[in-house]
Amino acid sequence: RDVLGSRGLGDVYKRQHAVSVLMKNGDWASLHYPEIVKASNFGRTIFDKRGWLWATSSRIESGGLFCLNYNGTIADTSDDQHRFITRFTNQDGALLEQLAVYCIAEDKEGVIWIGTNRGPLVLNNPSRYFNDNFYCTQIKVPRNDDSGLADFLLVNEAINAIAIDGANRKWIGTASNGIYLISADGMETIHHFTEENSPLLSNSIVSIAIHPRTGEVFIGTGKGLVSYQSDATEAENSFKESNVRAYPNPVRPDYSGVITVTGMVYDSDVKIVDTAGHLIYQGTSLGGQFTWDGRNKQGRRVATGIYMVLAADSEGKEGIVTKIAFIK
């Protein structure tokens, strides 16, 4: 169900001095907030898990980030919480000068990720946005060169698009340097795709969207659309036999690719054992999907036989079993 539709809203705009909301019944509602009078028009908008509206405004001189908690009453602004911030301070107390805000996304943990002309900013506790002592976080990535130094994540990149995949990883599209796949905590760059090392049509990324069931990542560039088959999908809420599927199955002698198991819950602990109960391989699902290269812990291709896939949630309270057949 569409997030806007579930709240009875059709679309949200900034028109002149107000936030204009097109209701599902076709009527317009205008919400007036003094702090956005001089702001440029809204760019990207999202509703987070709390139902709060976040809207970007990208101009350096008059742009920023607007947040609105309308408390479920569109027509009554007297109980609203709202704030438009144009000057951001990081966790070290440093003022981020000449900042332009381009995009925004909420991850699986409710953390807000903001794309700017100076890399990504993170709101680990979005409810503090209305506080006077609010600050954003610039993730520090250690250099791991014995210097003890760290660099801010993608600080020299202009971030045009951010999308969150089923494993809570961040797909970050830049204005001129392709697309990055960043680990869930932001500390590791898993992939960096450019037009030089991948089928990307351009290093200028305009938008990113991810199909929740298949994990396919659709990347809009300045020269057209391209897709990439990711190894993470949206997780299931619970294990169901009808949702769990392994493919290819059986695995035939001429197949050398990965075996995929879908229908997992988030961060499933997965073990593959033979019929004697010996552990062959284990790992953690990426969102709702787990992949295996068909090899044991020593790196050798497994023998002909039936292998059991034992999956359990991260707390060990729920699990499921499926089978994979190998033919050699």
Predicted features along the sequence, with ranges:
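Glycine-centered tight-turn motifs at strand-turn-strand junctions
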Residues: 279-302, 313-317
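C-terminal tail/sorting-segment detector
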Residues: 308-328
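Short loop/turn segments immediately following beta-strands, especially the blade-tip
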Residues: 24-28, 68-79, 124-136, 183-187, ...
